[in-house]
Curated annotation (Swiss-Prot):
PANTHER family reported for this sequence: CHAPERONE SURA
Gene that specifies this protein: surA
GO (cellular component) term, any one: outer membrane-bounded periplasmic space
Protein's name in the database: Chaperone SurA
One Pfam entry name: Rotamase_3
Molecular-function annotations in GO: peptide binding; peptidyl-prolyl cis-trans isomerase activity; unfolded protein binding
Origin: domain of life: Bacteria
UniProt domain comment: The PPIase activity resides only in the second parvulin domain. The N-terminal region and the C-terminal tail are necessary and sufficient for the chaperone activity of SurA. The PPIase activity is dispensable for SurA to function as a chaperone. The N-terminal region and the C-terminal tail are also required for porin recognition.
The entry's keywords: Chaperone, Isomerase, Periplasm, Repeat, Rotamase, Signal
Enzyme type, top EC level: isomerase
Length: 427
């Protein structure tokens, strides 16, 4: 998402007029220049999607709220000692360029065409990386999914449904305060009802999300991307399973407010998953304080020659191999998934003919000779389903926990909004 934003003409680097504070956020501030820049980004992104661009006044409060929550997370990162090294940052920039089909020089040129300096882009990426790590520490690492939860999910009607249904969704969230009273709930209900009526009368969903939603994805038009049925609350999944594409739900009461969903696309179907496995054995010789790298290579060469001259591979492995997990079994690693092995070993194994011993080669562990004894494709559909279920349950818990945590840090923070015309109740 960040790479797309950087290359969508979404960043405005024009010289700003005299700056001023628009929000005090605990020990930091949000400046008018930051708000103006982000509003411009959002407007440019909407324009490139072909939508009508809302006026600046309609976006400012929504964008300011996002900047406040981002600022709080960056402050947590600072207090937690989270640092992004130049090497990590360069790697992230390279990945963004690669995903956009560009070299680093082409990426720099694209940024320049969009009015953004490379240094500004690096800072934007750095902020996103810090926020990601804060969320990993504060939210993701606390989430646990047991084997029993996975089994229960796969046995449930919802679990079975999730294997065949996937939805591309958008949402509009009208929130209520954490300790909402009846007046708060009625106010939110009136607002979501008004939004729903405008949608039924033909208002653009994305525009309404940008103008009204409190969800994290509001400025993307409420786009949630593809979600498995199992990632959604059961009632949502059942509702969507029979809902036509393009339709919206009525307002739904959820713990932190009201939500309206739009079903953008639907897809489904699951296939058997086949995994390649290789039956392989090897001899590992490691360098040590008493055996140099050159001597280790020479020993591996001598063992290779002895095998080629007819000596038994398994017996030599028992006598010489320094892999404690396989030496006593004649070097036999049994059936292995190539993806579980280091790249050099995997490449040698892929190129080896069955029954033919490879010449010695080096990995991080030492010098090897190997022999492929067989190849097969195994049905790993069940393991894939279990991994998919684990991912679904973790993602569902993460989404729920993240929204709760973001609301918590916002509620606990000292925030003073100084933007003229802002909703002071939002403080």
């Amino acid at each position: 998402m960040l790479g797309v934003a950087l290359l969508s003409g979404a960043v405005h680097a024009a010289v700003q007029p005299l700056d001023r504070v628009v929000a005090i956020v605990d020990n930091d501030v949000v400046m008018q220049s930051q708000l103006d820049q982000r509003v411009h980004e959002v407007q440019q992104t909407i324009a490139k999607r072909g939508g009508g661009v809302p006026p600046t006044s309609a976006l400012e409060q929504q964008v300011l709220e996002r900047l406040i929550v981002e600022n709080l997370q960056l402050q947590i990162g600072e207090r937690s000692g989270i640092r992004i090294t130049d090497e990590e940052l360069n790697q992230a920039i390279g990945t963004i360029a690669q995903r956009n089909g560009m070299s680093l020089d082409q990426f720099r040129a694209a940024l320049a065409r969009d009015g953004l300096s490379f240094d500004d882009a690096r800072e934007q990426v750095k902020r996103e990386m810090i926020i990601s790590r804060v969320r990993q520490r504060r939210v993701a690492e606390r989430i646990q999914v047991s084997e029993q939860e996975v089994k229960n999910f796969l046995a449930s009607d919802l679990g079975k449904m999730q294997m065949s249904e996937e939805y591309r969704l958008a949402n509009i969230l009208i929130p209520t305060p954490e300790a909402a009273n009846s007046d708060d709930i009625q106010k939110a209900a009136r607002k979501v009802g008004d939004v729903y009526q405008q949608l039924r009368q033909g208002a653009d969903f994305g525009q309404m999300a940008i103008a009204n939603s409190a969800s994290e994805n509001a400025l993307e038009g409420g786009e949630m991307g593809w979600r498995k049925a199992g990632q959604l609350p059961p009632d949502f999944a059942k509702m969507l399973s029979s809902m036509p594409v393009g339709e919206i739900t009525q307002p739904i009461r959820i713990p932190n407010g009201f939500i309206i969903l739009k079903l953008e696309e639907k897809r489904g179907g699951s296939e058997n998953v086949l995994r390649d496995e290789v039956h392989v054995r090897h001899i590992l010789i490691k360098p040590s304080e008493i055996r140099s790298e050159a001597a280790t290579e020479q020993l591996a060469e001598r063992l290779y020659d002895r095998i080629k001259n007819g000596e038994d591979f398994g017996e030599l492995a028992k006598s010489f191999s320094e892999d404690p997990g396989s030496a006593l079994n004649g070097g036999d690693l049994n059936w292995v998934d190539p993806n579980s092995l280091v790249p050099e070993f995997r490449e040698q194994m892929a190129n080896a003919q069955q029954g033919v011993v490879t010449k010695p080669f080096k990995t991080q562990y030492g010098w090897h000779v190997l022999e492929v004894l067989g190849r097969r494709a195994t049905d790993s559909t069940e393991q894939a389903r279990e991994q998919q279920a684990l991912s679904v349950l973790r993602n569902r818990k993460y989404d729920e926990e993240l929204q709760t945590w973001l609301r918590q840090i916002r509620d606990e923070a000292y925030v003073e909004i100084k933007l003229p015309g802002a909703d002071q109740a939002a403080q």
